[in-house]
Amino acid sequence: MKNKFAALVITLFVLVLAIDNVTTECLEGCECNQDSTGKTCRPKQGSNVSPAVCLAQYCYHGYC
């Protein structure tokens, strides 16, 4: 029974993280990469934000 409960908790945690990532607007200095099917973020033109920082974020379709 403990294993089933632990699996449920882990599954819910991963689901919450997935939902949070999908609905996150890109950080300041980043913009949504419309060419990417994963809707990742990229640095805005002239921004000094690292590409790695932007790529760590996902953007919701409405922000693209």
UniProtKB/Swiss-Prot annotation:
Keyword list, A-Z: Disulfide bond, Neurotoxin, Secreted, Signal, Toxin
GO cellular-component term (any): extracellular region
Similarity comment text for this entry: Belongs to the scolopendra neurotoxin 6 family.
Keyword Secreted found: yes
Protein's name according to its UniProt entry: Putative neurotoxin 6
Subcellular localization: Secreted
Signal peptide positions on this chain: 1-24
Known tissue expression: Expressed by the venom gland.
Entry keyword Disulfide bond: yes
Modification note: Contains 3 disulfide bonds.
Main location: secreted
GO terms assigned for molecular function: toxin activity
